[in-house]
């Protein structure tokens, strides 16, 4: 049974010449220039090159490495092209690339005839495209589909890898799926690159005399794509926010092992809207559809992965505790899914990584029964993974990544013992250098997944890298926490709109009046309020220091203290209106 399409008749073009003419863009594969196509710069229409031959000299010629698709805004079409790439390794023997730069090229003239409001809206949409051009963690391959895990691809019918790449891919993990419609309609199969958002990390281990390659491929689902505070919980279809499938692949002595784990936000209807406070209150939405939402979510998981064990790592007190309790209540209605509550902070604190052994005592037997996927050098299937662990904390980032790396380590130990590389007394931690490499790729995977959802690197990364917290790591976590606060409150509204646009949740159309929600008072009022607050604190401190001189100083000090308190109260009362909020779509 084939694992990689090395003998496939189908292969994507991997390098292109982009010619820019006044009236069109022309894209030609360098290896087959006669197979190119053109995009009309006036209306965005795409035609095979032989139907619209080039004439005259281009105004600019450049090299690109892929076409990501097209998107239509008010003024017309924009063409996404990959302008820079980096080879990051091999997935089952075939090269993988990371997007390091991409650009949306405008193909429109309709803006000349637009109303003032449409021009204003188009300016905002262009801002969203600019934000998307710097999207982190985008991967692709010209020779194999990255969206399918090893077990799934090995069980597909013979010849599946001869189909066009976009037909092989699982749409839920294709970041640019919404952009591919025009290219698919024009049957430009050799140009259509399914782009995956997630992470790919790889390490080469020595392991006595048995060299091994360990890689982690994480795949972000696009069905509830979003940012940390603006996409929580699930939608009515049961799609969870920050849902990521992570696959740990071990290649050793001709064997290939695969372990799947998934993460995703607690699949209830809940929200946590930013309001300038450090930790906004959680709100559980009481909705008659909630039981069905949970059922839909886990039914889908069971269909795809088999037995599911839901591991809830949230706190058992405060807002998190209330959410966890509501989750547990709904899970009682699903007898076929095992639910395990484990208060990570209470048991492990911030430093005791080894205390995850307490969790393993609860779930280890079932985890080992779920097993892993294994094929030998002749591609015979020796083992199948019968189920997965679904982990979550509040963000499904920091605590979740520590836990998933721990489970990955446990599985690796079992795999090495399975083929005799280690005996029953040995494990990956026996080999110090290899153990460091293994933990590093899990930590870097956690950082990349966190960057996509929260905008910063993961917290608790030291627990994954070193098994303990270090002073440097504590400082890094503090800086990341402050960055998250700033991004969540003042940047993520725009970023959420960009993600809603790229995922197709919001489709641009000509509407009168504009369907964009008003921006609110943040741009004009927040700087003034901030200046008053800083000024008030400064003057109050100074007048208090001078207050012993006379009564007027006391009165001045009291006045400025009152002004400062008033500004603080005003900001607190209007916190939600002073943050960056999405303008395109509702929360659910």
UniProtKB/Swiss-Prot annotation:
Purpose of the protein: Phosphoinositide phosphatase that hydrolyzes PtdIns(3)P and PtdIns(4)P.
Recorded topology in the membrane: Multi-pass membrane protein
Lineage: Eukaryota, Viridiplantae, Streptophyta, Embryophyta, Tracheophyta
EC number of this enzyme: 3.1.3.-
GO CC annotations, alphabetized: endoplasmic reticulum; endoplasmic reticulum membrane
GO molecular function: phosphatase activity
Gene name of this polypeptide: SAC8
InterPro entries associated with the record: SAC_dom
Alphabetical UniProt keywords: Endoplasmic reticulum, Hydrolase, Membrane, Transmembrane, Transmembrane helix
Name by which UniProt lists this protein: Phosphoinositide phosphatase SAC8
Principal location listed in the UniProt entry: endoplasmic reticulum
Domain of life where this protein originates: Eukaryota
Organism: Arabidopsis thaliana
Regions crossing the membrane: 524-544, 555-575
Residues covered by the SAC domain: 129-455
Location of the protein in the cell: Endoplasmic reticulum membrane
Keyword set includes Metal-binding: no
Domain notes: The phosphatase catalytic core motif (or RXNCXDCLDRTN motif) from the SAC domain is found in metal-independent protein phosphatases and inositol polyphosphate phosphatases.
Position of sequence motif Phosphatase catalytic core: 390-401
Region (Disordered): 37-56
């Amino acid at each position: 049974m084939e694992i990689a399409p090395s003998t496939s008749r189908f292969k994507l073009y991997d390098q292109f010449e982009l010619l820019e003419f006044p009236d069109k863009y022309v894209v030609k594969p360098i290896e087959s220039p006669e197979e190119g196509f053109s995009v009309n710069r006036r209306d965005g229409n795409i035609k095979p090159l032989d139907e619209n031959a080039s004439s005259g000299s281009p105004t600019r010629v450049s090299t690109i490495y892929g076409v990501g698709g097209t998107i239509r805004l008010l003024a017309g079409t924009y063409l996404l092209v990959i302008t820079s790439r980096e080879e990051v390794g091999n997935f089952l023997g075939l090269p993988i690339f990371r997007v390091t730069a991409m650009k949306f090229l405008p193909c429109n003239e309709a803006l000349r005839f637009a109303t003032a409001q449409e021009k204003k809206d188009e300016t905002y949409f262009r801002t969203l495209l600019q934000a998307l051009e710097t999207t982190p963690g985008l991967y692709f391959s010209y020779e194999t589909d990255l969206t399918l895990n090893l077990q799934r691809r090995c069980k597909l019918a013979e010849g599946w890898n001869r189909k066009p790449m976009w037909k092989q891919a699982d749409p839920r993990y294709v970041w640019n799926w919404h952009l591919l419609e025009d290219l698919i309609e024009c049957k430009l199969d050799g140009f259509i690159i399914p782009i995956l958002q997630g992470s790919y990390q790889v390490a080469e281990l020595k392991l006595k005399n048995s060299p091994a390659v360990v890689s982690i491929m994480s795949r972000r689902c696009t069905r509830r794509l979003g940012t940390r505070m603006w996409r929580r919980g699930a939608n009515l279809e049961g799609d969870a926010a920050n849902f990521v499938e992570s696959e740990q692949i071990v290649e050793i002595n001709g064997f290939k092992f695969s372990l799947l784990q998934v993460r995703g936000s607690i699949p209830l209807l809940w929200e946590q809207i930013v309001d300038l406070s450090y930790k906004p209150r959680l709100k559980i939405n009481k909705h008659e559809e909630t039981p069905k939402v949970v059922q839909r979510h886990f039914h889908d998981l069971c269909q795809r992965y088999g037995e599911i064990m839901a591991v809830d790592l949230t706190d058992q007190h405060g807002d998190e505790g209330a959410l966890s309790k509501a989750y547990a209540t709904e899970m009682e209605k699903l007898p076929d899914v095992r639910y395990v509550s484990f208060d990570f902070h209470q048991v492990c604190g911030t430093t005791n990584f080894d205390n995850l052994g307490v969790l393993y005592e609860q779930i280890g037997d079932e985890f080992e029964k779920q097993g892993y996927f294994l094929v030998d050098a002749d591609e015979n299937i020796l083992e199948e993974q019968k189920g997965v662990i679904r982990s979550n904390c509040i963000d499904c980032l920091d605590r979740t990544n520590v836990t998933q790396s721990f489970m990955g380590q446990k599985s690796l130990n079992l795999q090495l013992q399975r083929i005799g590389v280690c005996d029953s007394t040995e494990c990956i931690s026996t080999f110090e250098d290899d153990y460091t490499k293994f933990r590093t790729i899990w930590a870097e995977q956690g950082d990349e997944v966190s960057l996509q959802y929260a905008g910063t690197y993961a917290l608790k990364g030291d627990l994954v890298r070193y098994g303990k917290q270090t002073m440097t790591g504590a400082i890094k976590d503090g800086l990341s926490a402050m960055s998250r606060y700033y991004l969540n409150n003042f940047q993520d509204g725009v970023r959420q709109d960009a993600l809603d646009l790229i995922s197709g949740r919001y489709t641009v159309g000509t509407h009168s009046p504009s369907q964009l929600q008003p921006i609110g008072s943040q741009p004009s009022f927040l700087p003034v309020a901030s200046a008053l607050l800083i000024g008030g604190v400064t003057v109050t401190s100074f007048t208090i220091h001078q207050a012993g001189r006379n009564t007027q100083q006391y009165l001045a000090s009291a006045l400025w203290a009152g002004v400062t308190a008033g500004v603080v109260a005003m900001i607190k009362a209007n916190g939600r209106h002073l943050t960056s909020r999405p303008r395109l779509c509702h929360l659910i």
